[in-house]
């Protein structure tokens, strides 16, 4: 997936082994899958979508094969899955979206994962500012729908 490659390039530029993505918009950007409870971990060579039972089947069907989908719940916490994935990939330097997390959540992730988090929110601002072809097509389609809706109601207004 091209977006994962761009994220990995950003990780290399920042000297990080991985990024923990908790912001829903950035999760969707990275995986193409929209969900509200969980996280995405992107390392230099792997990607993990970690979610609960509500989304597990849809995630497994929707994401590309280069993203590993795992489920938390039933005795396994999200932080455990993140730590296991980090251990599998040898992650030492972990980035996180410092503006998307409360200060308490940021400190809690550091504590439960046993690593210092490195701020990297600007990576996603930079990557998401430049639109790929699929995003441009979606924006054009949305514009056409909005214009048609306006034309349909303009005579009523």
For each predicted feature, which ranges?
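Flexible, acidic/His-enriched mid-domain "rim/lid" segments that flank
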Residues: 4, 45, 77-157
